[in-house]
Amino acid sequence: MLELKQVGKVYQREQQTFTALSDISLKIEAGEIYGIIGYSGAGKSTLIRLLNGLEKPTSGDVLVNGQSIVGLSEQAMRPIRQKIGMIFQHFNLLWSKTILENIALPLKLAGVGKKERLAKAKEMLALVELTDLGAAYPSELSGGQKQRVAIARALISEPAILLCDEATSALDPKTTNSILSLLAKINQEMGITIVLVTHEMDAVRRICQRIAVMAAGRVIEEGTTQAIFETPQAEVTKAFVSESLVITPSETAASIEQLLTRVPEGTIIKLRFNEEQSSQPVIGQLMRRYPSVEVSVISGSLQQTINGALGYLYIQIQASPDDLKQALSDLSQQTIEVEVLRHG
């Protein structure tokens, strides 16, 4: 559906060159929700502009449905762009037009008759659950409602692809969740490929099947949502995952130090587990099996991803050397990832 092959993008600015993207290779399958995450300046927005042909790469190739769009003229790009919808952080609505007129605008520009385009706009209003607001104006709507209007407008031309550039960044958490649920519903009911570009790990965790992590113009890690959260490799990815799981490194370190002031003995361990393991009484089993084992919970978190639950648990174990060794072995045999952070 969408593919980038060794794409690079370099800008020339006042006798200086700025490399926005370097050697980007991605393949986004038809019908999936694909997340692209990175901090500001990572190159996310440049990448999304390459996907819809608003920018041309300096090197490499961009393919839409197997067709290279790099060398196409503006005229040749028009029918391709009609199948690519896009929403932004800012809603870009026309304040002097009603909500129905805003949604119908792409069809008006395409020469579709008034009766037909307004009928289609009403269908889109129903899809985004704003049926009663067709006669309202943008100034009367909340931020979440405005983004729903922007989504309806992007979908009215029946695109096969929806590009979302920081679409939830200006919204509060509750509204963000409602927009993400709407995008998931659209993907499921209409089969539209969605590319979600964001700096919010919680957003990609909730609805994306796969994720690419960007930093300094490169893709530094890519994989399924489950794999990225369970075993992040790059430091940037680990930071994103920690933020999403509400276990920041500084908070964890502070909790560990606080515990060690009270109980200086013991081994500090980080456990990482998935949905199946989260339902097992792991700690209770350890304490029953090894009478000398005492466990203190430092901090933990369990979150849902589209592929299932995953979580972290930081614990302190006090035990005899033999029991500790055997307990760690038992945990590992249950496919729980065990990381010893500090020996007692």
Curated annotation (Swiss-Prot):
The keyword Transmembrane helix does not apply. The gene is metN. Gene3D superfamilies: 3.30.70.260, P-loop containing nucleotide triphosphate hydrolases. The complex is composed of two ATP-binding proteins (MetN), two transmembrane proteins (MetI) and a solute-binding protein (MetQ). GO terms for cellular component: plasma membrane. It comes from Latilactobacillus sakei subsp. sakei (strain 23K). ATP binds at G38, Y39, S40, G41, A42, G43, K44, S45. One of its GO terms (molecular function) is ATP hydrolysis activity. The keyword Glycoprotein does not apply. It catalyses: L-methionine(out) + ATP + H2O = L-methionine(in) + ADP + phosphate + H(+); D-methionine(out) + ATP + H2O = D-methionine(in) + ADP + phosphate + H(+). This is Methionine import ATP-binding protein MetN. Its EC number is 7.4.2.11. SMART domains: AAA, NIL. InterPro entries: AAA+_ATPase, ABC_transporter-like_ATP-bd, ABC_transporter-like_CS, ACT-like_dom_sf, MetN_ABC, MetN_ABC_transporter-like, NIL_domain, P-loop_NTPase. It is found in: Cell membrane. Pfam families: ABC_tran, NIL. It is a peripheral membrane protein. Belongs to the ABC transporter superfamily. Methionine importer (TC 3.A.1.24) family. Residues 2-241 form the ABC transporter domain. Keywords: Amino-acid transport, ATP-binding, Cell membrane, Membrane, Nucleotide-binding, Translocase, Transport. Part of the ABC transporter complex MetNIQ involved in methionine import. Responsible for energy coupling to the transport system.
